[in-house]
Amino acid sequence: MFRSQRMKFLELVVLERDVDRVLEYLGKTALVHLRLSAAARGSSSHCAQSKEYVGRLEEACKYLGVSGECAFSPGDSLPTEEDYTLAQQILAEVDALHAREREGDAPSVPRGKSSVAHDSANEEQFQGEKCALGSMRGPALCALLRRFALQERVHRTRDALESTRHTYRIAGWLPAHEAKDLVAGLDNVTTGRMAVRLFEPQELSFIRDGSEHVPVCYQHGRFVRSYERMVSSYGCPPYGLVDPTPFVAFSYALLFGIMFGDLGQGLLFFVLGLLLRTRRVRALNRWAHLDYVFLSVGFSSMVMGFLTGEFFAHGTLLAPLIRSVTALCGGVPRDHILHLMPSHGSLHTLMAFFGFTLFLGFVINSLGLIINIVNQVRLRHALQQCVQKRECADSSFFGTWLPLQCAYHFLEFHSGSLMRLQWACLSWVFFVKSFWSVCASVCVRGFLKVLACI
């Protein structure tokens, strides 16, 4: 969960007669990240023919008013000879109707005569024929368009593969745990007419010399997967390192609830997440991948809003409900479970919650530092990480803050000199941070100079 999936490099050699079906199978499984040739060949005659059919079928769909969306389904396959025959037949019917319509648009009008009624009758006749042809041929036309569009993509990919006269070489990355099933499926497609090898990343020269990098593939649940784009917008972690996405998903939802705790506003976010999840509103489908983001932040905000008694910024609307809940739990009926607004007797709760948020920030920052250190160790930059001034300064800052805050709260309970000790703690922490920053900078520069001399 906290690391990317282990990858393997697939090298597959197939015959020319099997390459189209192999590429179709790989596309439907969506498991292989193909490594295409840098010097791709020009478009082949097969690709040009498929592109021509796709263009003509799209024009036919547009002429007949048929929705020709190329949303591929698992049942789509490459066109057969029957599909070619049917496509030619439908295109011939559309071309004939279009030719008749063009001839009817330019009639010969005798001098002194009007042809408005005649043109109107012809137009209605052609519109009726187009509607009839679209209703009869529409489903078949859409299916043919998807099949020929699939064939065009297969041919375009095939033109970018390394090949000899009779064979094609397909190379790419796939998750290691999917390799066995994929090879078995390829063997079934080609009936054994193939040669396949699997490599570990360290066995490849272009990975060892750093000219290419292993692609990263994650296997997250639905909740964490919805945060993947948020993390990847800052950059994708390299292969083999700790994946921060689960930490981001948990901390983001938690902090959102703490900062924007409101039962009413959280309910709106939660309902929006449900709409994205069910895909009932077509206009929101482009953001459907954020369904669990809105569900999680909405739920977190609702919980925090219930604890503080906030409902659309009103602090009294939930008071009767919270009194019933607190009385049911065996306590004294209260208007707020967490009363954070300034009032008599609420200062202690406010400071306790403030300390909780500081501790939570300390934990999140410490996790970030630990993840960074682990990643640097895996990248074999451990020595550089140990003497890096920023990490030393941040580690000393957070490492000093926690024991000092614990001592502060302990002495707060036993003595009255609170303000002086608080300022002393903060001054000491910031002094240590600045001192460590300067010392670490000097140590790093000196150490690097010594290494350069050696």
From Swiss-Prot:
It is found in: Cell membrane. GO terms for molecular function: ATPase binding; proton-transporting ATPase activity, rotational mechanism. It is a multi-pass membrane protein. The chain crosses the membrane at residues 254-274, 293-313, 351-371, 424-444. One of its GO terms (biological process) is vacuolar acidification. It comes from the Bacteria. The keyword Transmembrane helix applies. Signal peptide: none annotated. Residues 101-121 are annotated as: Disordered. Keywords: Cell membrane, Hydrogen ion transport, Ion transport, Membrane, Transmembrane, Transmembrane helix, Transport. PANTHER family: V-TYPE PROTON ATPASE SUBUNIT A, VACUOLAR PROTON ATPASES. This is V-type ATP synthase subunit I 2. It comes from Treponema pallidum (strain Nichols). The gene is atpI2.
